[in-house]
Amino acid sequence: MRGKTFRFEMQRDLVSFPLSPAVRVKLVSAGFQTAEELLEVKPSELSKEVGISKAEALETLQIIRRECLTNKPRYAGTSESHKKCTALELLEQEHTQGFIITFCSALDDILGGGVPLMKTTEICGAPGVGKTQLCMQLAVDVQIPECFGGVAGEAVFIDTEGSFMVDRVVDLATACIQHLQLIAEKHKGEEHRKALEDFTLDNILSHIYYFRCRDYTELLAQVYLLPDFLSEHSKVRLVIVDGIAFPFRHDLDDLSLRTRLLNGLAQQMISLANNHRLAVILTNQMTTKIDRNQALLVPALGESWGHAATIRLIFHWDRKQRLATLYKSPSQKECTVLFQIKPQGFRDTVVTSACSLQTEGSLSTRKRSRDPEEEL
């Protein structure tokens, strides 16, 4: 039994060991994922490859080997990550997990009610189609009080491209407040009125935690430090990484290392979503793929990355109209809907005969130029 436990522990993810955050990030950045990969590594070799002192390397190896030989291993982070549960409990979680609405009912409908908690959702699309706009919209909407159908949470916004616009967030938050005020006037309930007292512009902005990451090392460091941040901010129900591809496409030429780092990052995001009962949003760029003498736009980072997120949405254009295609979902069928971005944020649009809403044809649309007035 002890031998089986040891073999199991050697497959354990390095981020689950009680290592310092700085060492943990350096190990992952160097491409190490599991304890097994460090089994035959000497302290001097680890020091050189990871960029830490020999004393730190020796201490790291000792901690990992000691943990692997312990009959009752300890896991970093929340104890819920390894708690047993039944299929019935999982079903009940699915029914009560909650959703973050987008204010576009067509988009909410194809997602099953909105962006779901406890799942990772990837939003792909060409520049200017609305990925960052949706991220900012969700950072506001996640804070909607429960009596209005929201989840009353907070948001973490990790920005890799510098696309976050606080003035735009002010517009979205102001529109959201006005919308809820209209609902409260209709209901005339004390609960709604009291909830709006705290749902102010200042409170909304103060509960969006913004982090700017300029390269993949900073991004990995921030993501792997999130468990500590979330333990201090237990109301966070949304983590956004706006521009997951940007740092990896421009700063990393080693494709093998890039794949390992991305896989580790994806697993960390899944763990955060499950352990902290929050939604994860990842935005991705599109790249051109030549297939049978035809140029198609496909999500960046390759096919293996396509399995990382639970849900994949693709935003694209049909003439001057924006469309969203639910390309991948474990519970909803593939579907394409129209949406528009108004000064107030994401909203529904009227289907016209000129727009076919055909998924296959729409997704093969190349990048198009946009009129200046289309930009918000």
From Swiss-Prot:
Residues 79-136 are annotated as: Interaction with RAD51B, RAD51D and XRCC3. The lineage of its organism: Eukaryota, Metazoa, Chordata, Craniata, Vertebrata. PROSITE patterns: RECA_2. The gene is RAD51C. Essential for the homologous recombination (HR) pathway of DNA repair. Involved in the homologous recombination repair (HRR) pathway of double-stranded DNA breaks arising during DNA replication or induced by DNA-damaging agents. Part of the RAD51 paralog protein complexes BCDX2 and CX3 which act at different stages of the BRCA1-BRCA2-dependent HR pathway. The modification Phosphoserine is found at S20. The keyword Oxidoreductase does not apply. One of its GO terms (molecular function) is DNA binding. Its main location: nucleus. It comes from Homo sapiens. This is DNA repair protein RAD51 homolog 3. GO terms for biological process: DNA recombination; DNA repair; double-strand break repair via homologous recombination; female meiosis sister chromatid cohesion; male meiosis I; meiotic DNA recombinase assembly; positive regulation of G2/M transition of mitotic cell cycle; reciprocal meiotic recombination. Induction: Stress-induced increase in the mitochondrial levels is seen. Expressed in a variety of tissues, with highest expression in testis, heart muscle, spleen and prostate. It is found in: Nucleus; Cytoplasm; Cytoplasm, Perinuclear region; Mitochondrion.
